Amino acid sequence: MYKWFIALLLSSSVALAHPLRLSLCEIEFYSKENLLSVNLKLFLTDVNEALVFDPYSKELAFCQPNEHSDADKMLMDYLNRFFYVKFNKKKIGLEIKKKKLSGQGDNTALWIYLEKSVEGKFDSMEIKNAVFTDLFYDQNNIVYIHVNDKSKSIMLNKETSTYELNF
């Protein structure tokens, strides 16, 4: 009985030492407006680890008066490697419209709002969200997709990093 209690205690303390590896993404496209918008919610410690290899770095200072002059460029370089949206097999070049921070400490999130005007009739949309899968084997990325009047939610990760919708 005592050995089982110790084993349970050790296994639960190990589980508590591993944080939840998760990002949220909402993709919206309404053909009447010809606008693609993407909202990403990423934990700031994960962003810092991906960009400057230090989760608690204050070097980039996102959304602060002393934000590093290359912070947006570094962020977009990373996102362009691990995240994209394609219409009819053509990658859409997203641009940062705004960013904001929410939460405190390890729970501080960096919200990134990206947009791009797009024209034409679309038959397919492909999404890749492999953000932080280069750093964490257990990273999961939840994606909510809204196209005109249809919605879908998917979970992407290291093994399955892309998803295709056909209209």
At which residue positions do the language-model features occur?
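N-terminal soluble domains immediately following signal/targeting peptides that reside
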Residues: 18-167
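Sec-dependent N-terminal signal peptides
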Residues: 4-13
